[in-house]
Every structure is written in structure tokens, then in C-alpha cells.
Regions:
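Active-site-adjacent bridging/hinge elements
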Residues: 1-8, 94
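N-terminal ordered "arm"
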Residues: 3, 10-56
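C-terminal accessory domains and tails appended to enzymatic cores
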Residues: 9, 128-310
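Fold-independent oxyanion-binding glycine-rich loops
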Residues: 20, 44, 61-64, 75, ...
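Active-site cofactor/cluster-binding pocket
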Residues: 49-50, 57-106
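Short alpha-helices
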Residues: 83-161
Length: 310
């Protein structure tokens, strides 16, 4: 059972840092209509920024930044969160420190499957676009339709809790199907291809090539009924992190908690109930971080398992 938030947090008005995928781009286009500007891109390892803009002055969108100086908004399953962070799972009481250890697996299967671009509509009280194609773009971002196919009960709970019965009806009746085919055609035309994890085209892009994405973003803005995009900023590497996958257990929770309190944890999320991906500002060493070091080695030896609801 999801616990609806009693009060919604305000969305800070700051330059944006986005994730380098379709959900990040759709989130940017949506917030651009409300006056937001793009200042950076984060690929979960390196933070790219416009010259002269500080990350601490920005809002990270479709990203779960763990550093307390960078406010962020996202929908991933977290272990820790700064006061400046807006996270869908935490708003609805799914991801909390009390869920760690024996309750983690049970909590993880209830994690939020809703893309950030859709989350932003809900958070700001913006009505959904009536056009089913525009809705389909929001659903395609972060593969909500695939999550529904695999984990219908969880997706159903979230969409009903957010008041999105219309999307649920269209998912269950498969009326988005022709629009998904159109989206695949558009993405394929711009050179986006399937990945080993997803059998349909994704929209990952290199942050260093952000300006070259302009033709695609112009088409995407037109498809969504947004204002045309005339330019995109050139961004440069500003902050290089060290990214790891770790086998999760209570000892890892305690060790990462220290990294979080010492401001060394840049971002993190649970990708399985027993696996956490982290980006640290200081690389791990066997001598100073034995618990986390061993958790990385254990994770490398694990067999690949099916991903839980995302």
C-alpha cells in the first residue's frame, strides 16, 4: 500500500542538470516551458557543466544526487537522501532507512516505476497532454510500458495513486502501440539503437556531444507541443566520480552512510534488492574501505538476475 504525501515539496527554480537519456530530455523540455534553463548533464559518472555555472547553484533532474549541496529530483530507490532532494519513493514512504536489511526486498518490489517527466507533471499539478502520442512519449521514457508488462500490479498501484487512470487504461488496452512504433521510428532515424538490456531503441547520448543533439530535440519538442529549441549549451567535464556496483548488505549500508555524511557520495541507487550502484568522489581502496571493496568484488562474481520493477 502506498502512503500518499500529505504535502508536496516546492520545486526549486534553478538552472538544470539532466540525465543523459530520453527521460532527462523530456524533463528538460517540460521545465523549459516554465522558464528553466539547461546548465549541465550527468551520466552517473562524470558531471558536465556550462562554463561559469556552479553545480551547487543548479537543480539535478531525473537524477538522484546524494551530495547535499546539489538539490535533485528523481524516482530511483535510495538508501540516503539530503533534505534538498525530492524523491518519489521517499514521498510515498517506500524507500526509507527503516526498510533496510530484512525488509529491503519486500520494499524494493514496490519501487516507483514512473518516469521523471511524468512525475514532474504530477508534482507541478500540470494536466497530462490530451494527445495520446504525447502521452506515449512520456510512457516510453524509462520504459514504463515494459514495466507494466512485467510488473502490472506495481505499475497499477502507482498510476492510481497519482491519479493517472487514463494512462493505466491505455496501457491495459494497448492503445499506445501504434504511437510506440512511431517513437521507435523517430529514435531509429536519429541513430538511437537497442541495448543489451532493452530490445527497443534507447536515447543515451554523450554529454560532450550535447549541441549535436539539437536536431533531435527540435523534433522532440515539436512532437510534445513545446516551444522550439534554438540552441543547446556546450558542456565540459567538471566533476569526475568513481562508479561501482556493490553487493548490498547491512555492512554496506553503514559504510555508505559514512560516505554520505562525509559528502563523498555523489549519487547512488539500488538496481536490485541486493545490488547498489554508487558514484563516489574519492575512489575506493582496499586499505581504507575494506567493506565496500569486498562488496564490489562480491558483486562482480554474482550471476546476472532479472531486474526488479524499474
Amino acid at each position: 500500500m502506498l502512503s500518499s504525501p500529505k504535502q508536496l515539496p516546492p520545486l526549486p527554480f534553478r538552472p538544470l542538470i539532466i540525465h543523459n537519456d530520453l527521460d532527462g530530455l523530456l524533463s528538460y523540455l517540460f521545465l523549459r516551458e516554465k522558464g528553466y534553463e539547461l546548465a549541465g548533464v550527468y551520466d552517473l559518472e562524470t558531471l558536465y557543466m556550462k562554463p561559469g555555472v556552479r553545480p551547487a547553484d543548479c537543480l539535478a533532474v531525473d537524477l538522484d544526487i546524494s551530495h547535499p549541496l546539489i538539490p535533485s529530483i528523481g524516482h530511483h530507490f535510495l538508501l540516503f537522501s539530503a533534505e534538498s532532494h525530492i524523491n518519489m519513493n521517499m514521498l510515498f514512504g517506500v524507500s526509507t532507512p527503516e526498510n533496510v536489511s530484512e525488509r529491503m526486498k519486500r520494499a524494493f518490489v514496490s519501487k516507483c516505476p514512473v518516469p521523471t517527466a511524468l512525475f514532474l507533471h504530477w508534482l507541478t499539478g500540470t494536466p497530462l497532454p490530451a494527445d495520446p502520442l504525447r502521452q506515449a512519449w512520456l510512457v516510453y521514457a524509462d520504459s514504463l510500458h515494459e514495466s507494466y508488462r512485467k510488473y502490472a500490479p506495481n505499475v497499477t498501484r502507482w498510476l492510481l495513486a497519482m491519479g493517472y487512470g487514463e494512462i493505466l487504461h491505455r496501457l491495459s488496452s494497448d492503445t499506445y502501440a501504434p504511437h510506440f512504433r512511431h517513437i521507435v521510428d523517430v529514435l531509429s532515424r536519429f541513430g538511437f539503437s537497442p541495448t543489451t538490456q532493452k530490445p527497443f531503441p534507447q536515447c543515451r547520448f554523450s554529454p560532450s556531444r550535447l549541441p549535436s543533439l539539437l536536431p533531435f530535440l527540435q523534433v522532440l519538442a515539436r512532437e510534445m507541443g513545446f516551444r522550439s529549441v534554438d540552441n543547446l549549451p556546450a558542456v565540459q567535464p567538471r566533476l569526475q566520480g568513481a562508479r561501482y556496483s556493490l553487493r548490498f548488505h547491512p555492512g554496506v549500508f553503514e559504510a555508505l552512510g559514512r560516505k554520505f555524511r562525509e559528502w563523498e557520495l555523489l549519487s547512488h541507487s539500488l538496481v536490485y534488492h541486493d545490488q547498489v550502484e554508487v558514484t563516489l568522489l574519492v575512489p575506493l581502496s582496499e586499505q581504507s574501505d575494506p567493506v565496500l571493496w569486498n562488496a564490489v568484488r562480491t558483486c562482480l562474481s554474482l550471476p546476472k538476475t532479472e531486474k526488479s520493477p524499474a
